[in-house]
């Protein structure tokens, strides 16, 4: 096997260990650190500010903005079915893919409501990322692509 400088290799679990636990542990450590983490959080802040500004320019209702801003966090309920299902549902609600598709549809269909929902949704994702709440790993809610959060954060350097 050729070894690449700086490459990390995940070894197979040893006999007598739980492969699922080892996989979850490997996933949970895959978060960014240092300057890259700061850059991703600043990108989140820029997304929040940009989408909120676009919403204001678009002339959306601030009551609607306030009412819908936390709707993506209803995806927390997925954790009632366990960490794996919770992570899948949370990540579906906090990925850029669905709101960007909705935004494109809003422009294409000239639908102010659709566009407003997309802008609010993206603003929500942006502020979450700015605050360090990244996409979740199946190891548990506290394990994100931006690092550990909550009580799990104390074990992160």
Residue ranges and their predicted role:
Residues 2-157:
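N-terminal membrane-targeting hydrophobic helices
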């Amino acid at each position: 096997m050729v070894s690449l400088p700086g490459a990390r290799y995940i070894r197979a679990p040893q006999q007598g260990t739980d492969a699922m636990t080892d996989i979850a542990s490997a996933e949970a450590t895959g978060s960014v650190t240092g300057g890259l983490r700061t850059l991703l959080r600043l990108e989140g802040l820029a997304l929040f500010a940009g989408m909120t500004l676009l919403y204001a320019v678009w002339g959306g209702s601030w009551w609607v903005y306030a009412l819908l801003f936390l709707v993506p966090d209803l995806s927390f309920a997925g954790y009632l079915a366990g960490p794996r299902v919770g992570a899948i549902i949370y990540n579906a609600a906090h990925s850029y893919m669905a709101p960007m598709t909705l935004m494109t549809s809003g422009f294409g269909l000239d639908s102010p409501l659709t566009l407003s929902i997309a802008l609010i949704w993206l603003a929500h994702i942006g502020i979450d990322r700015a605050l360090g709440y990244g996409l979740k790993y199946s190891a548990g809610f506290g394990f994100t692509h931006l690092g550990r959060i909550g009580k799990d954060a104390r074990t992160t350097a």
